């Protein structure tokens, strides 16, 4: 570039005409510049202005995502609500949805030799219950006796909102509907499981479950899901005199069928001691059978 400029100026340099500074191209500013300045001038970085996305679009996306999340959570909650059709099948589905149901028997292995279960389908006199407790203690010295009353378990569930069957029991009570098959067994099973995880649960224990089972279905479910029954104790006086006072014919027949179910497998024992003068003889016979 500098050579070209000299070539154009050569005729003028050898001519006699006076060359004025105004006729000479002004290249001094270019020649005096440093390479860095030349590069800066020829390679200017042009910053492109970014397009600003509309704020309303982001707000719209956030609202849509929030609604979708709320809808998802609401559906998950609806799936865990209490079933309105409380048949046995529906109750089994309720157990599976809430994570209660277990396919294996609760008491098995080492616990089956440490725990024994005695059921009393119907009892109205607590004095009789105390007598049975004392007989078991004298029969198995050093063995703990644990009494389970399903009616107390139901009240505990009703009073504590944090318990699993709280809302189910209140709905059944409001609708005046009977308890579905398997509900009482589920409560008893839960109580036994809680006991087995305590310090007392590490010792040998005789369980007495009063006023249970009162249907054959509950008896079968207990032996399938919880443990085998050692003896089903039938209080002759209460079954004959007290049962008709507090239960209708259908309920009486269901409880009597429980007696027949355990009697068919040789695990039912009828106790006839109330107002019986031969108490000592009764105790000897009972201890042999237990």
From Swiss-Prot:
The chain crosses the membrane at residues 55-74. The keyword Transmembrane applies. GO terms for cellular component: mitochondrial membrane. It is a single-pass membrane protein. Keywords: Membrane, Mitochondrion, Transit peptide, Transmembrane, Transmembrane helix. It is found in: Mitochondrion membrane. Residues 1-26 form a transit peptide. Belongs to the AIM36 family. This is Altered inheritance of mitochondria protein 36, mitochondrial. It comes from Candida tropicalis (strain ATCC MYA-3404 / T1) (Yeast). The gene is AIM36.
